[in-house]
């Protein structure tokens, strides 16, 4: 079965084609990727310091058809070769989701194909199955992105249990807001991680929120406030030397990243112990953070569990993960469509409510 996937939940337009045959034959899942196209809107939103929903929707309209053509050209396929269409149904920006839904449903109806709405987070959770070493069910998923920070137990396709989540800012959101405090460019997550590599460890004693809370929830708003307080103290010193200012920013970025990484790693290890799982999956945009990956690898080597990552290019939003998740859903549901004829979207959508019965 060849599935077309369309992702338009926020500021990336992604289109991909996935063939389920390798998965069904027990071969590495990544062998099923036939073609993909991806366009990021980062440059367009940079002047605004964040995503402008109206601009995002308009850009999705411009990009989705050329990306479909690009994916078909890569794969050597025609529209008539497609067996089903998957699209991001939610959560996300309403206007952006509507573009993908309308395009996908119109195409599916025109070609007389089934369509399936995919939960955006399910796409992220399953994307590590496309890596070189796929995890075994059940596994713990640490999902960290600009909008979500969650620990999930994944027992199979469509079998998800929330173990803990952020009570305020998501980790990716904290990265972006802190980067803005330090005067870094948008998007802030990658910028602050790069700056942290130049910083010295332990210069600032920043809090590690909820590290010893006893549960698996997170909170990062207080950490952002602590960074703000440090910047105010530094400003009051009236230091004007460029080298000193640059080192201050690097040291503060290092302490900030170290604090977030410490909390994420500790909670992940606790989730593994509580559930007895031996496999941990890191997914979402922050999953590309090299400091977090290094810390998880070190902890795994000392404590006897395995960590699995999606390919770096699949950490951010993309069409491959939607095509893949949609394909696995359709196999689990015996190729049934799960959407009506309407252009239905779910800007707010709890993943567990979409579990298979």
From Swiss-Prot:
Signal peptide per UniProt: none
- What's any one GO cellular component for it? cytoplasm
Which metal ions or organic cofactors does this protein require, according to UniProt?
Fe(2+)
Positions that bind Fe cation: 120, 124, 317
Q: Which reaction does it catalyse?
A: L-threonylcarbamoyladenylate + adenosine(37) in tRNA = N(6)-L-threonylcarbamoyladenosine(37) in tRNA + AMP + H(+)
Taxonomically, the superkingdom here is Bacteria
The encoding gene is tsaD
HAMAP family registered for this protein in UniProt: TsaD
InterPro entries under this entry?
A: ATPase_NBD, Gcp-like_dom, KAE1/TsaD, Peptidase_M22_CS, TsaD
- Its name, as the record gives it, is tRNA N6-adenosine threonylcarbamoyltransferase
Q: What is its EC number?
A: 2.3.1.234
GO MF, one example? N(6)-L-threonylcarbamoyladenine synthase activity
What does the UniProt function comment say about this protein? Answer: Required for the formation of a threonylcarbamoyl group on adenosine at position 37 (t(6)A37) in tRNAs that read codons beginning with adenine. Is involved in the transfer of the threonylcarbamoyl moiety of threonylcarbamoyl-AMP (TC-AMP) to the N6 group of A37, together with TsaE and TsaB. TsaD likely plays a direct catalytic role in this reaction.
The enzyme's first-digit EC class, named in words, is transferase
Where is the protein found, in the record's own terms? Cytoplasm
A GO term (biological process) for this protein? tRNA threonylcarbamoyladenosine modification
Q: What protein family does this chain belong to? A: Belongs to the KAE1 / TsaD family.
Question: What keywords are assigned to this protein?
Answer: Acyltransferase, Cytoplasm, Iron, Metal-binding, Transferase, tRNA processing
Q: Name one Pfam family in it.
A: TsaD
């Amino acid at each position: 079965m060849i599935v077309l996937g369309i992702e338009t939940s926020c500021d990336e337009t992604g289109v991909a084609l996935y063939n389920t045959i390798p998965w069904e034959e027990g071969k590495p899942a990544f062998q099923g990727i036939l073609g993909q196209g991806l366009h990021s809107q980062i440059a367009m939103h940079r002047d605004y310091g964040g995503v402008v929903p109206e601009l995002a929707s308009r850009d999705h309209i411009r990009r989705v058809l050329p990306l479909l053509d690009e994916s078909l050209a890569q794969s050597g396929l025609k529209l008539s070769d497609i067996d089903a269409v998957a699209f991001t149904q939610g959560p996300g920006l309403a206007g952006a989701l509507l573009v993908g839904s309308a395009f996908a449903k119109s195409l599916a109806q025109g070609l007389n194909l089934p369509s399936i709405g995919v939960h955006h987070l399910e796409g992220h959770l399953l994307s590590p199955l496309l890596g070189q070493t796929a995890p075994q069910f059940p596994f713990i998923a640490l999902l960290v992105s600009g909008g979500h920070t969650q620990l999930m137990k994944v027992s199979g396709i469509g079998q998800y249990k929330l173990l803990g989540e952020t009570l305020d800012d998501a980790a990716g959101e904290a990265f972006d807001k802190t980067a803005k405090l330090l005067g870094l460019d948008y998007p802030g997550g990658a910028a602050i991680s790069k700056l942290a590599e130049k910083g010295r460890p332990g210069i600032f004693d920043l809090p590690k929120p909820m590290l010893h809370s006893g549960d698996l929830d997170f909170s990062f708003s207080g950490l952002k406030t602590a960074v703000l307080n440090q910047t105010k103290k530094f400003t009051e010193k009236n230091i004007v030397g460029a080298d000193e200012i640059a080192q201050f920013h690097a040291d503060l970025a290092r302490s900030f990243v170290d604090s977030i990484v410490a909390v994420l790693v500790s909670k992940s290890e606790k989730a593994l112990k509580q559930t007895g799982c031996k496999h941990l999956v890191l997914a979402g945009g922050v999953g590309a953070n090299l400091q977090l990956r290094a810390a998880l690898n070190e902890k795994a080597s000392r404590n006897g569990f395995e960590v699995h990552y999606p390919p770096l290019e699949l950490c951010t939003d993309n069409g491959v993960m939607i095509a893949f998740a949609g394909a696995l859903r359709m196999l689990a549901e015996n190729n049934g469509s799960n959407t009506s004829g309407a252009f239905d979207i779910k800007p707010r959508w709890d993943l567990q409510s979409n579990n298979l019965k």
